């Protein structure tokens, strides 16, 4: 069995290699320069570039072809595939992976919508890899991922509100008032 994920898990390419997971990276464009998240730009560098750029970065999902190529490679090797992805409520990545899976006819692909991102997604990917290395069956791994999903709530705090304002998540006025009062929101990732 092969485990595949995307860079929404905040695992580097090297992290994935160490645990035997294949990563299909999301794409990020900052100031006209394109990067593959987790491959040629890490989270810290991304935030540094964001802080220095007057323009909001553009993120995009991997292409259907990116996933189909990886799926086809492992299908041709006779591998069953467990593909674990960033929440479908936060990104189109899961749906792109699903479309790619439907294109690869000779593959046995099991798609998991983690219902989260970042550390919550990384936890699921890492747990699946450890269970695989321990010789657990695919059914056992999928059941455990369901338990982890049920037990996981992902929260974030932000040092300031400028990205929420720029991204239209909160109004400029509310952002200005919250900033003046020193309010730093705690954001919970919804499982819906």
Question: Regions from the language model: what does each represent?
Answer:
Residues 2, 12-16, 21-22, 27, ...:
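Mixed-charge interfacial surface used for oligomerization/domain docking
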Residues 2-61:
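N-terminal glycine-rich anion-binding loop in soluble enzyme alpha/beta folds
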Residues 43-46, 67, 97, 125:
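A general structural signal for well-ordered alpha-helical segments in protein cores
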Residues 60-70:
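Glycine-rich, highly charged phosphate/nucleotide-binding loops
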Residues 74-81:
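Glycine-rich phosphate-binding loop signature in dinucleotide/nucleotide-binding domains
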């Amino acid at each position: 069995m092969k485990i595949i994920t995307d860079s929404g898990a905040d695992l580097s390419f090297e992290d994935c290699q160490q645990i035997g997971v294949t990563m299909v990276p999301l794409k990020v464009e900052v100031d006209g320069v394109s990067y593959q998240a987790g491959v040629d730009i890490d989270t810290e560098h991304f935030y540094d570039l964001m802080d220095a750029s007057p323009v909001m970065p553009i993120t995009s999902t991997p292409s259907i072809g990116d996933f189909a190529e990886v799926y086809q490679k492992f299908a041709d090797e006779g591998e069953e595939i467990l593909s674990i992805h960033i929440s479908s409520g936060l990104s189109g990545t899961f749906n792109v992976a699903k479309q790619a899976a439907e294109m690869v006819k000779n593959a046995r692909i099991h798609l998991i919508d983690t219902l989260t991102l970042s550390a919550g997604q990384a936890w699921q990917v890492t747990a699946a890899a450890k269970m695989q290395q321990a010789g657990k069956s695919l059914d056992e791994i999928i059941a455990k991922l369901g338990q982890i999903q049920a037990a996981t709530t992902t929260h974030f705090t932000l040092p300031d509100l400028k990205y929420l304002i720029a991204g239209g998540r909160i109004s400029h006025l509310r952002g200005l008032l919250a900033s003046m009062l020193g309010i730093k929101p705690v954001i919970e990732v919804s499982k819906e």
